[in-house]
Amino acid sequence: IILLGFIALLAVSCDKDDHLAPDKSKYVYDIPQTDLPVDAIVGAYYTNITSSSSWLKSGKKIYAGTPLLGEYLSTTSGVLQQQLAWADEAALDFLIVTWDAASADNTLITNFKSVRTATNAKVRLVINYNTKHLKVSNDKPLQEEENLNKMINDFTNTLVPLFNDEAYYKMNGRPVILITPSNLSSSALKSIDYSLVIPALKKAVSELGYDLYTIGEFTTGWVAPVNYEEHQIASFDGVTVNDWSTNMYDRYYAFFSFVDLNWANWKTTISKWNTDFVPCIFPSYNDRINSTSSYKYTFGQDGETADYINFCNVAKR
């Protein structure tokens, strides 16, 4: 009877239409030209190049063509001046600099402020605070007093003084700070509880006169927000996802509409926590130049302007 009932249920509940291919137009579609009623706030990641080896992999160049500034180091005279000039030409509001308590990080920040003042550049600075140097683990998580105090001391002793500088970017008076990573590795899921860490950090910084605007950085794209713990998203004022690699053919073939659907899902899902979604875009590139064994699909050797415009339109939606 159970077997017959199961078969009968299948016979009633199934319809041949259920097995037809989905409507392609729902998933693969063109992105329309999109205009914003006001100017967007725009920032860009800055890579601090501290070694000539950064331009090589296994002794071979990891780029094609000729860099306009050559195989530079960020500390090379004239480099930062030109980069800030380009940033102003592009109307960037800020450059994002990673800070992981390394001396090279502090040197770059010092140089940035100095060059900005000397050249009357307009672009400002935002810190991306990397928790790696805190060496937290499931057994010694960041929310434990000792580790949390280390993080707070990083801010009170080094980063908060930057907020006093006109060169640091503030949104409506609130210093913007990225904190990475929001996506914790599967072996370290208990190493950070952001629902405890971020309020404690904000409280400490507010006692020094600043209301932080925190952005959690997810370094892995294509993952739906429901796959993360609530604290990894809801603890922040905003979140950004910065890796949209075309590591599958479908993601390459329908890249812009797939990203559009993904971002719409992010915005809808996290709105219940009053968390902003901050889109992250990038020019197309050929990853096989960086790694001959790369399996990522590429849009073209040199990138196409039309592709970048499409990506910008996705972000503006």
Where do the language-model regions lie?
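Sec-dependent signal peptide recognition
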Residues: 1-4
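C-terminal motif of bacterial Sec signal peptides marking the signal peptidase cleavage site
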Residues: 10-13
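Bacterial signal peptide processing site
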Residues: 15-18
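Glycan-processing catalytic domains of CAZymes
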Residues: 20-317
